[in-house]
Amino acid sequence: MAFITLRRAFCHKSILWIPGAVVALKIHPASHAPKAVTDRLSVCFCSLQPELFRVRFHHAYCKNFHSEKGNDFHPVGEPWSSQAQEWNQPGQSLQNEDEEMLFRRLSYFTSFEEVLSFISALDTLPVPLAMAALLRICEIGRRDGEQRLPEGVLENRAFQALCLRCERDPSHLTNAGLVTALQSLLTLLPADPQSSLMLSLVAECQRRLQRGNLEVHHLCVLGESLAMLQGASCETLKLVVRQLQSKSVETFAPEEITSVYRILQVCPEEVDKHQMFLNTLNNFSISVVPYLSPKSISHVLTALVALDQTHALPLLIKLGKYVVRYIPRFTNEELRKVLEAFVYFGHSDRFFTEALEQHVSALCFSLDPAVASSVMGYCSRKRILSKPIFDVVSEIVVCQWDRLSPSQIAELIEPFGKLNYVPPNAPALFRKVENVLCARLHHFPPKMLLRLLHSCALIERHPVNFMSKLFSPFFLQRLQGKESYLDRLSLAQLTQLFLTSVLECPFYKGPKLLPKYQVKSFLTPCCSLETPLDLHLYKSVVIGLIDLLGSRLYFASKVLTPYYYTIDVEVKLDEDGFVLPCTVDEDIHKRVALCIDGPQRFCLDSKHLLGKEATKQRHLRLLGYQVVQLPYHELELLTSRLELVDYLQRKLFSQSSAVHW
């Protein structure tokens, strides 16, 4: 809702329409005006004689007029051809034209020069016409993809005269023209909140706001402009929010719902004050979701994150349903915001994953690296092992590594280790990663480098050539930075890499990690390299073991080994295969480590262990433990205590006929 397009047409009436991000002045024959437009009659705009030049608003319900990305500046099928020459023929007098013809002529111009030449030729310049010309210039800049107007336009004397004329007396503008002008100028003019033009427009908006003359649509446009111009500290913005809260949410159009969320998003620290209004808004928005564009859905999800609306589950589910449909239509930035919101709210479903797989596979090498990083981050956080996505990403790293920044390389590679997936092109992938690290090692921040190499080790791609650098005092000092100590997660990753070098890389002869940098346990509350025990499954297994072994004395729980790992349940055996009491420390021939693996130790909805759990079990075997895995998907099939005991007996003792109890 940022720009005004003066549309070409031949008729008696004028309609100001708002397709998503563009306010467009479009002229239709009165007999053919769409009913959805005529039903939403609204405010006069920018007329020297308001009775001659009226405008109307319509909302985004009318899909025929909907401009999803806000860049449809002309009717479909009408080319952008300059019409300036026909207005410069001899015998025509600009001064004698009526007001409607002036606005109509302005709608034909397609360049800055045409608009400025037209304005320069006028003897008098009414405020409404000056504002329409100014907005036409802004719209041309937006159409041409300008981030701001060119310096040549800003320094043009006719343009400066336009700004001065609009600044002097904005009271002649209608509410729609005023708020739209403010929003439009913020987009392409230098963002100086103290400029006299901005101050004049804001002051006029404040006067009308205090009189209570602004409708919901005007409040939304004004609120977004004030948020952009002055931020959350703006008292006028708070007044806008209060007036919006006094309105009936049920009368809000879809684009107005989106605007309200964006306005509230600017003030997350005041969310408690607005929570009742937000609850009403969240509940009503469920019915509006089908009418939202992909851009609006992305905006709403972003606002829900900023406002921490984790309890708005029905709205999130409805938004998620439509996100699945719109994935190919999202821009890269919008899709990133959607993924961030889904991670924040913990939302995932197989339909979204399938749609994401299709989208990534279809784009393949044209997939934007930033989007690829966001997709992999989403899969990693949600523990979603999507082989189609991971395979495409591995090919992107191999073939387009020179397009990737160090942070993107790390973000794309780390999920492979976390989710314990080795792609089909693993030799080429990790050879490329090694080459990149050799060439650009100093471009990787210390913690990022450590995370990257640690994730490689989780899938047995051991960074032997870099271990000496990781364990060197110089790197450890860089890793610590200005802090007084190294964070525990970094120490745990270093310790596990050191243990890996000892157990899996006996040929490594470089520096060792000093004991003062080694953690005592990988299982810690905030930064664990092990997944905590599932207590429900643990209690079931304990009951079964007591029935099987005859006493709680014959097994120990949550045993911390000298090698930093914590074993869920440990059973000790002597040389003859007899089960020993857990308190005995002599004559132990074998230790059995029972891994009670709950759902959190696997990738989502699969039987595929996470990288850290697979590494733990691999290391325990190398340390001499007999590892017995008790996965949740097997335990949940047991329907009786007798079945549980029989299951544990088979798991514990089928591997050795010499075991007794």
From Swiss-Prot:
Task: Tell me the keywords, alphabetical order.
Answer: Mitochondrion, Transit peptide
SMART domains with a match to the protein in the record:
RAP (SM00952)
Q: Which domain of life is it from?
A: Eukaryota
Locations listed in the record? Mitochondrion
Tissue specificity, in the record's words, reads: Expression detected in spleen, testis, colon, heart, smooth muscle, kidney, brain, lung, liver, brown and white adipose tissue with highest expression in testis and smooth muscle.
Please give a single GO biological process term from the UniProt record.
Answer: positive regulation of mitochondrial translation
Does the entry feature the keyword Mitochondrion, yes or no? yes
Task of the protein: Required for normal mitochondrial respiration. Increases steady-state levels and half-lives of a subset of mature mitochondrial mRNAs MT-ND2, MT-ND3, MT-CYTB, MT-CO2, and MT-ATP8/6. Promotes MT-CO1 mRNA translation and increases mitochondrial complex IV assembly and activity.
Q: What is known of its domains?
A: RAP domain is required for FASTKD3 function in mRNA stability and translation.
What's this protein's family per the entry?
Belongs to the FAST kinase family.
Stated name of the protein: FAST kinase domain-containing protein 3, mitochondrial
Species this chain originates from: Mus musculus (Mouse)
| Protein encoded by which gene | Fastkd3
